[in-house]
Design a protein with these regions (language model features):
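A conserved hydrophobic position in a structured secondary element of the catalytic/binding core
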Residues: 143
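Cell wall/extracellular polymer interaction/catalysis modules
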Residues: 1-137, 147-164
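Short cysteine clusters
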Residues: 140
């Protein structure tokens, strides 16, 4: 089942409207690495990553795995591991998944630029926990943790990020 995301910062799901944060560059059909935009299109949820030291394993049908201190995500378009989860330390530019804030306490890896990976088309596009003020992301979609858990429990399988 697909939730609809709009550029005004709302996510529609089963007759409800939820507040969400989007990339600081809005929603774009021309996603590029570093543009800060959320990619337009249907983004399937591939798997869940979670901080087992902070939350219980999420329920639902998606594969899930805990985030460890050695987990990262390569965002260096020049490296062979671009847009893949990596083990830290890693020689290329990367994000650490084990963050000190709570944004990555629960992460749904979205199917963007992963089949196949195309260098420079964007990496680390996730559905994750929003900041308290719903500040813009670097291109991800972010929700309050209770809303994110509800969507997963109710069987959401994809996001449709729309530019209209």
């Amino acid at each position: 089942m697909i939730a609809e995301v709009r550029g005004n910062g709302t996510l529609a799901w089963r007759g409800r409207r939820l507040r969400c944060a989007l990339g600081r560059g809005g929603i774009t059909t021309m996603k590029q690495e570093g543009d800060g935009a959320t990619p337009a299109g249907i983004l399937p949820l591939r798997r869940l990553l979670y901080r087992a030291d902070r939350i219980a394993p999420p329920t639902g049908a998606l594969p899930r795995e805990p985030i460890g201190t050695g987990d990262g995500w390569c965002d260096d378009p020049a490296h062979a591991d671009y847009n893949h989860q990596v083990t830290l330390p890693h020689p290329a530019r990367h994000e650490e998944l084990s963050r000190t804030d709570h944004l990555y306490d629960l992460v749904a890896v979205l199917g963007w630029n992963d089949d196949p990976v195309m260098r420079g088309r964007g990496s680390a596009i996730f559905l994750h926990v929003a900041r308290d003020d719903y500040a813009p992301t670097e291109g991800c979609v972010a929700l309050a943790l209770p809303d994110l858990l509800m969507l997963l429990t109710e069987g959401m399988t994809a996001l449709h990020a729309r530019t209209d």
